[in-house]
């Protein structure tokens, strides 16, 4: 099992290109099942979750090719097996995203109950109840969600809680349904908007994405197209924190600043100087120690839960004390224990972590517990005195493309070693 070895204490400096968004490319790959002809997806990040999704589509019979630029062509017309098996789904919760499009396009689907990051309950009932409201015959049996429908019918669906994958699954299913579907209390994330834009490019009729009410007028068929995935706002935020925590100056290219308002506001509150263009962000923290920032995670457009761990690392070496409140997922403070091993002063009570900044962290062996937790440990390692060894980095490969190469490009001392 690979590990990362980091020698801290080097301010980062330089520019780096941001990859396509993991949380956008996975539903967009699932949406290719809706098309009646081949699709090409561009700006695809080279990630383990992308590989898993491609393997899942291939297992179902779709034909896939990848070129040297990581453009993925998917021909869904050869799909013949409508099962998403446990051995693939258990590694990635996003596998449930094939349920809606598979049912809408082929009238049947069997998807194993999902796995992925160990960060709490993410119930599938929102997906199941929404599809049932659209006329699907659904059962959960032997760990599988089994669904059938001749053709789904438009429905008014009110989501009990805001769910990104729930919104995406129902939006894809509704794209080929008969009539109009209205999703209320819908997720507003930029990745939901990107999926809607992709489906509309395929000939769909979706309006309201980015608001809490999405209207989908079902169409008879959707065609293949070329679509470029939007830049990854979480990778962007992570590299901005890397610049801030090390007292560096970084410029990020091929990003989407408009998707990052809450994160950029917190970085400015921490004392970072920011320059922002249409598709680039420059952060300057040279010669300054960050100030502690309190934050509360919530669905978009509020502060993203996927940036909570990175800001905990930043607060660990900041001036002052601040509270971090996690409202989206339970059990998402596992990185706090590992940061404490490096000397961080963190007290966790329920869904709140109180972080008192210390002058320095010390390198130590630490273990990644989930995707964003692993990013926080790398960030802590970049600023710690001495050597930090991060174990179980397969988590990081699920969501960050070539992270050690990009950080090295900015001047970090970081290398991957085999386990």
Curated annotation (Swiss-Prot):
<dbReference type="GO" id="GO:0051301">
    <property type="term" value="P:cell division"/>
</dbReference>
<dbReference type="InterPro" id="IPR050068">
    <property type="entry name" value="MurA_subfamily"/>
</dbReference>
<dbReference type="InterPro" id="IPR013792">
    <property type="entry name" value="RNA3'P_cycl/enolpyr_Trfase_a/b"/>
</dbReference>
<feature type="binding site">
    <location>
        <position position="93"/>
    </location>
    <ligand>
        <name>UDP-N-acetyl-alpha-D-glucosamine</name>
    </ligand>
</feature>
<keyword id="KW-0670">Pyruvate</keyword>
<keyword id="KW-0963">Cytoplasm</keyword>
<dbReference type="GO" id="GO:0008360">
    <property type="term" value="P:regulation of cell shape"/>
</dbReference>
<keyword id="KW-0131">Cell cycle</keyword>
<dbReference type="Pfam" id="PF00275">
    <property type="entry name" value="EPSP_synthase"/>
</dbReference>
<feature type="active site" description="Proton donor">
    <location>
        <position position="117"/>
    </location>
</feature>
<keyword id="KW-0132">Cell division</keyword>
<feature type="modified residue" description="2-(S-cysteinyl)pyruvic acid O-phosphothioketal">
    <location>
        <position position="117"/>
    </location>
</feature>
<feature type="binding site">
    <location>
        <position position="328"/>
    </location>
    <ligand>
        <name>UDP-N-acetyl-alpha-D-glucosamine</name>
    </ligand>
</feature>
<comment type="pathway">
    <text>Cell wall biogenesis; peptidoglycan biosynthesis.</text>
</comment>
<keyword id="KW-0133">Cell shape</keyword>
<feature type="binding site">
    <location>
        <begin position="22"/>
        <end position="23"/>
    </location>
    <ligand>
        <name>phosphoenolpyruvate</name>
    </ligand>
</feature>
<dbReference type="GO" id="GO:0009252">
    <property type="term" value="P:peptidoglycan biosynthetic process"/>
</dbReference>
<dbReference type="GO" id="GO:0005737">
    <property type="term" value="C:cytoplasm"/>
</dbReference>
<dbReference type="GO" id="GO:0019277">
    <property type="term" value="P:UDP-N-acetylgalactosamine biosynthetic process"/>
</dbReference>
<keyword id="KW-0808">Transferase</keyword>
<comment type="function">
    <text>Cell wall formation. Adds enolpyruvyl to UDP-N-acetylglucosamine.</text>
</comment>
<dbReference type="InterPro" id="IPR005750">
    <property type="entry name" value="UDP_GlcNAc_COvinyl_MurA"/>
</dbReference>
<protein>
    <recommendedName>
        <fullName>UDP-N-acetylglucosamine 1-carboxyvinyltransferase</fullName>
        <ecNumber>2.5.1.7</ecNumber>
    </recommendedName>
</protein>
<dbReference type="InterPro" id="IPR036968">
    <property type="entry name" value="Enolpyruvate_Tfrase_sf"/>
</dbReference>
<keyword id="KW-0573">Peptidoglycan synthesis</keyword>
<feature type="binding site">
    <location>
        <position position="306"/>
    </location>
    <ligand>
        <name>UDP-N-acetyl-alpha-D-glucosamine</name>
    </ligand>
</feature>
<dbReference type="GO" id="GO:0008760">
    <property type="term" value="F:UDP-N-acetylglucosamine 1-carboxyvinyltransferase activity"/>
</dbReference>
<dbReference type="InterPro" id="IPR001986">
    <property type="entry name" value="Enolpyruvate_Tfrase_dom"/>
</dbReference>
<keyword id="KW-0961">Cell wall biogenesis/degradation</keyword>
<comment type="similarity">
    <text>Belongs to the EPSP synthase family. MurA subfamily.</text>
</comment>
<dbReference type="GO" id="GO:0071555">
    <property type="term" value="P:cell wall organization"/>
</dbReference>
């Amino acid at each position: 099992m690979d590990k990362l070895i980091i020698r801290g204490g080097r301010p980062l400096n330089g520019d780096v290109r941001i990859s396509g968004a993991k949380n956008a490319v996975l539903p967009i790959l699932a949406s290719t099942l809706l098309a009646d002809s081949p699709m090409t997806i561009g700006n695809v990040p080279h990630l383990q979750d992308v590989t898993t999704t491609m393997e899942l589509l291939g297992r179902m019979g779709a034909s896939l090719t990848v070129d040297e630029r990581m453009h993925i062509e998917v021909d869904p017309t050869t799909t013949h097996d409508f099962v998403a098996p446990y051995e693939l789904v258990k590694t990635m919760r996003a596998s449930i995203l094939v349920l809606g499009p598979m049912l809408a396009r082929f009238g049947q689907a069997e998807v194993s109950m999902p796995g992925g990051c160990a960060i709490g309950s993410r119930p599938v009932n929102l997906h199941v109840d929404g599809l049932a409201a659209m006329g699907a015959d659904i059962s959960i049996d032997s760990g599988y969600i089994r669904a059938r429908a001749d053709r789904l019918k438009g429905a008014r669906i009110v989501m009990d809680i805001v769910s990104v994958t729930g919104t995406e699954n129902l939006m894809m299913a509704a794209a080929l349904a008969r009539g109009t579907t209205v999703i209320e209390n819908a997720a507003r994330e930029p990745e939901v908007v990107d999926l809607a834009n992709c489906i509309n490019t395929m000939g769909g009729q979706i309006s309201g994405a980015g608001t809490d009410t999405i209207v989908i007028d079902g169409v008879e068929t959707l065609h293949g197209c070329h679509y470029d995935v939007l830049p990854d706002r979480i990778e962007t935020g992570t590299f901005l924190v890397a610049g801030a925590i090390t007292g560096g100056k970084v410029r990020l290219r091929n990003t989407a600043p408009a998707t990052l308002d809450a994160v950029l506001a917190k970085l400015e509150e921490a004392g970072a100087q920011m320059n922002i263009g249409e598709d680039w962000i420059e952060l300057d923290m040279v010669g300054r120690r960050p100030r502690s920032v309190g934050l509360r995670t919530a669905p978009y457009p509020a502060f993203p839960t996927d940036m909570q761990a990175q800001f905990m690392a930043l607060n660990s070496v900041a001036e002052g004390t601040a509270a971090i409140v996690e409202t989206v997922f339970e059990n998402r403070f596992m990185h706090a224990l590992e940061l404490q091993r490096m000397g961080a002063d963190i007290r966790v009570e329920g869904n709140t972590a109180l972080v008192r900044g210390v002058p320095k962290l010390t390198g130590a062996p630490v273990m990644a517990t989930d995707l964003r937790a692993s990013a926080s440990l790398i960030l802590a390692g970049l600023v710690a005195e001495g050597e930090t060894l991060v174990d179980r980095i397969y988590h990081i490969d699920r969501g960050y493309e070539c992270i050690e190469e990009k950080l090295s490009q900015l001047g970090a001392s970081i290398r991957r070693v085999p386990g």
